[in-house]
């Protein structure tokens, strides 16, 4: 965040944040370009490196969460996690190639009990595309971990700390809340 803030002093700086890159264009199209480039004898190292980094983000995010729980002497087995956001970008109902699903699957592999809440995503499409359900609404349930995966504007009305058990962990993927107590990329 400090690097992005400093870079923002340049008049023509575009402020892009690290996060979960999905969707049809950025998640897929670089492979078309790489394929054609390699057909013509050129290996686009930078494009492929970018895709490797983007594809590894779900694993990185979950590893940071598990490490934080371990520091607190907590086990991921049967820990509860809430993922806020399922779509591939904010304020959009599109679920295509969403990396949030990969975060869900990684958490599940570590033994977490995972809920997903996304008022923007169509629940029927979500079940059809990914085979599991999302929460229709938030309840009074408290979680060991809350992950803000997608920065929907409607999430500004949510205080993630109110969704946590004591000493719970919030991982704010996009730096949406700017809270010093949260984990960030």
Could you describe each region identified by the protein language model?
Residues 1-185:
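Structural/interface elements that position substrates and couple domains in central-metabolism enzymes
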